[in-house]
Every structure is written in structure tokens, then in C-alpha cells.
């Protein structure tokens, strides 16, 4: 004679189902890629125009993911002199690269290390009338000191926040506008239009934290 304890079997089945559900949930948790903190030195963003003439020259396109200058459409930001473009929105001039991505940006007021999250409500793309990173002394990332020094210096406590061309995020702190990032730059003797900057790249889609 075989006796079957139905209640005991139901308990065991429920326990098995709960175990399988837990294992399934654990397996479904995404494995996040590590956040990357990088330093870029001596990135040249030269103009070809003479002083007093309208700016000309190619924009230098940069990829946060690839950690280097790129030639294709997979760029996130682009530099020429003090101007920084994002790969999203519309061009303001014919000599700018086409915007093919969904990049955006804004200038955050706060020390680089204290900016731990992206405020998505502040993100803007480039347009025909304005850039996501404002141009002009005191408006975006730099001050122009004028005569007699004519120095261009990063504004302390300004952090650039970017959405990349494919929807990831990065924050950037510009350290210097002069070659080799001299502690006391001289606009007459140090080579200008050469960037040194730090950046932190969040490679995981939909994650807005830099922690």
C-alpha cells in the first residue's frame, strides 16, 4: 500500500518553485560594466584662421567609450579652440560635423568629485542658435582674462555633464587649455588650444550615477 501525503508534496513543490524563481531572478540581474575614470593630455583642437579672422579648421571629435579621437560618426563631443560640440541636435555652421547621435550636455556648478549623478532635466542638445556647452568667457567652462595676460583658464567648480551619442553618460573636468598643462601658463609662450581634462564614463545604459 502506498500512502501519499498531499500536503507534504505541496509544500515541497512550493519550496522548489520558490528556489527556481530565486535562481532565475539572480541569473536575470544584469552584470554592470565598471565605471571608467580617465585623464586625457594634450588633445589638440587647433584653428587654422589668423587672429582677428572668423574661426576655421576642423573640429576634433572624441569618443568617451573609445577613449580617443575618432573620425567617424561615433563621436560624443568635438573641440575647436574653446568651443565644445555635442553629437546631438543641429549644427550652427556649415563647417561643423553633422549631428548623428542623441548626445546632449550641460554645465554643472559643483566640484568634479561632488557631482555623482546626471540631472537629465538639464540636458540640452546643440541648436542653430546655441550650444549645449555655452561659449564665451564666463558662460561655460572658461574665463578669458583679457589684457595684459590674455589667458584662457578653466573656471573652478564647473563640471561638464554629457549624454553620449548612444545614450550613456560622462562627466568632464577641464584642467588646462595649454600644452603640458603648466601650473602658471603664459599665453605668449605656451602653446594654446591643447586640452588636458579628466573624465568619468558610465558605460551602462540607463544608469545616471557616477558612483
Each language-model region and where it sits:
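A short beta-strand micro-motif
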Residues: 160-164
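N-terminal secretory signal peptides that target proteins for export/translocation
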Residues: 1-9
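N-terminal "domain-start" segment
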Residues: 26-158, 180-184, 190-211
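Sec-dependent signal peptide recognition
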Residues: 10-18
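C-terminal motif of bacterial Sec signal peptides marking the signal peptidase cleavage site
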Residues: 21-24
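Glycine-centered tight beta-turn/hairpin loop motif at sheet-sheet or coil-to-beta transitions
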Residues: 165-169
Amino acid at each position: 500500500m502506498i500512502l501519499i501525503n498531499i500536503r507534504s508534496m505541496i509544500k515541497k513543490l512550493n519550496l522548489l518553485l520558490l528556489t527556481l524563481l530565486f535562481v532565475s531572478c539572480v541569473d536575470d540581474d544584469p552584470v554592470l560594466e565598471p565605471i571608467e575614470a580617465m585623464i586625457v593630455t594634450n588633445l589638440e583642437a587647433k584653428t587654422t584662421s589668423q587672429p582677428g579672422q572668423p574661426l576655421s579648421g576642423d573640429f576634433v571629435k572624441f569618443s568617451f567609450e573609445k577613449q580617443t579621437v575618432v573620425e567617424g560618426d561615433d563621436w560624443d563631443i568635438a573641440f575647436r579652440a574653446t568651443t565644445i560640440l555635442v553629437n546631438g541636435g543641429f549644427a550652427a555652421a556649415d563647417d561643423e560635423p553633422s549631428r548623428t547621435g542623441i548626445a546632449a550636455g550641460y554645465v554643472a556648478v559643483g566640484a568634479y568629485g561632488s557631482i555623482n549623478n546626471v540631472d537629465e532635466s538639464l540636458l540640452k542638445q546643440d541648436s542653430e542658435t546655441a550650444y549645449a556647452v555655452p561659449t564665451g568667457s564666463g558662460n561655460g567652462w572658461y574665463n578669458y582674462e583679457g589684457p595684459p595676460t590674455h589667458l584662457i583658464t578653466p573656471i573652478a567648480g564647473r563640471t561638464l555633464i554629457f549624454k553620449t551619442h548612444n545614450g550613456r553618460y560622462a562627466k568632464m573636468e577641464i584642467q588646462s587649455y595649454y600644452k603640458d598643462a603648466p601650473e602658471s601658463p603664459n599665453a605668449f609662450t605656451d602653446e594654446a588650444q591643447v586640452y588636458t581634462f579628466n573624465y568619468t564614463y558610465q558605460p551602462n545604459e540607463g544608469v545616471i550615477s557616477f558612483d
